[in-house]
Amino acid sequence: MDKPVVRISVRNLVEFILRSGDLDNRGGSSDREAMQKGSRLHRKIQGRMGSHYRAEVSLKYKTEYEDVSIQVEGRADGIFTEDGQCWIDEIKGVYADVSQLEKPVKVHRAQAMCYAWIYAQEQKPEKIGVQMTYGNLDTEELKFFREEYTLEELGLWYQNLLDRYHKWIAYQLAWKKERNASMSDLEFPFEYREGQRKIVSGVYHTISTGRQIFVQAPTGVGKTMSTIFPAVRAVGAGLGENIFYLTAKTITRTVAEEAFSILKEHGLKFKVITITAKEKLCFCDKTECNPENCLWARGHLDRVNDAVFELWTTQDSYDRDTLLEHAKKWQVCPFEMCLDLAVWVDAVICDYNYVFDPNVYLKRFFGEGTSGEYIFLIDEAHNLVDRGREMYSAHVDRADVLEAKRLAGDYSKGLVRALEKVNRQLRTLEKECTEYEILPNPGAVSLGMLQVMGEMDKLLEELHGKELPEQLLEFYFCVRDFLNIDELLDENYVVYTEMGEGGKVILRLFCVNPAANIHRCLEKGKSAVFFSATLLPMDYYRALLSTRKDDYGIYVTSPFRQENRCILTGRDVSSRYTRRGYEEYHRIASYIARTVWTRKGNYMVFFPSYKFMEDVLEVYENEFSAEWVRCISQTSGMNEREKEEFLEEFSASEGTLVGFCVMGGIFSEGIDLMGEKLIGAIIIGTGLPQIGTEREILRQYYDKKGVNGFDYAYRYPGMNKVLQSAGRVIRTQEDTGIILLLDERFTGKDYRNLFPAEWSDRGNCTLNTVEEQLGSFWNRIREKN
């Protein structure tokens, strides 16, 4: 049997094995201007060296181990001969004053040494030299560092470097054999529910063919296990490399962790990590990742490889508590250790942004030029539309530019000049803007922001180790975001200006259709599964989440008996803005009262906004309160503890509890209140988003595309919130409950066409008949039991 071949670039090898020192995020990033300047500087230096200088020489060398071949490859910046001596040149562009550099950076020297060793295998010289050339990106001033090595010295050094890397590869290969063997008899851990087998086979086939699939399956089918199980089997069969389970909310990450745990209880060996937000993993009050403010950042790079290797080789599940405990033991940053460990595991559970967000994505997996046989399982995929628009949009506010200019005065005249230029450009746009103004492109602002970024990067490098005002640093990230999105502008964007609250103009790059950007990310892997209980209408979600024409689609009907739940539409009530007022609030409050009086138990009432909820709640408490009914309400900005306390009320309640909530909020999706914990959901209105600039831009954009702009901007997003809220009731085969839709618009064809197939038994009611109809349903349930 042939040995596997592992390929790694020279740069990745030395930056992984030889990294050392502190973690420090105070330096600048590689912005477009710096990269362009660096490329120009490389070409200039290479051009000056004469005909004897060979630039960009491709080199590779394979080293044989008993279990694996490791091929190290890359391109040397330059190779030349001087006085009979061969030299390998490594060129680095920096903003720092090169005259102040005392010695080359360790990993830069190591890159040159690797190239020297590989090149020497062909030429066999007695000695070979390495030259580190540092050039200032602005002044183009150069400084050279030279060192000579014998072939024996280089050989010993290179072998030691590769042996340290081989340790990781050897364990990885041994683990994969053990992992794959554990799957030989792995079966689905439960008796298949109706629809589950259809999902499992559909997902496995999709992965095996390298395609994408959209799975619409109602709450309670068991979508999590039905997608994870076939993905795991596909990895074991060599059809995929890593699983990325992507979620929008913390609670769905927990469900995924539980699914993997159940499979492990049935014999699966699989390493699974959950990436938690940096703020939730940080030991410090503020996430200031530098050696002055964080003990864990000090010397982090000296210790992190040993920390990761120990955790990786001794455990298989890595949740927040495990990561924090291990990071404390090794005195390293838990978040950075988590990201490093993620490279070596079998499955990563994380938020959408670690794959899709251009500012946050895992560069270890999805950086430029990197890809793999990744399987993407995208949970609650309906959320990815708005999240995608948010991740791929950016803005610059003239008020922020002026504040940054004020703060920059103490640091850099060049930055002040660049900011004033952008300010003038925005002021010109401001004069032409009333409510909002659609533009063909950002115009000169893009170039101005590029110059600002260059000046800020220069400043950050010069100030290395010193603090900048927090507001100025935040503006730096705003500029970076703007430039990243500016590169993506195409027909899927609308560029527009609007007036901010402070009377200053805001220039926005608004992604109206995120499908192309999402597609570019998913192309880094092999296959993707989009699944949700509310992917209706499926064509809408396909249009906004995928550009492929060959995607599969599966519709799974509810496995639960229709007779266990009652769905009614109140046809004499409305939540339209034109109807809002005491009379309608009183009617809605009366509906709520008559519903909860019909049977003792727990109910949730979902409103389109906090204001609407508060207005109806006030009427309800003043005119319909009863001793045996207790009301609680969702508040804006609830933290995790408050959210848990709210949900605990539904477990502890023995009488009748009514939770007043907001559609599209934290209680309208991703929560499990089974059995008697929740027996009814009352949904007020059609969930239409509030009319605003971006919604109107969406409506106009899709009207021009020849589809119904109102549907795309308002009706479909609103109906999704309705379906999610309704999905809180009936979570298991034994559950019984009612769903009450309070808005006359639900009786119209435009909305009826959006109802899932299992709502075919939906009936209509009025305020005068609702008690009788619900009472009849509950009597049937009592008689059956």
Q: Model-derived features: where do they sit?
A:
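Signature of the SF2 helicase/ATPase Hel1-core->accessory helical subdomain module
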Residues: 227, 254, 328-347, 351-456, ...
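A contiguous, basic/glycine-rich beta-loop/short-helix subdomain that forms a polymer-engagement track
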Residues: 323-348, 359-366, 458-574, 579, ...
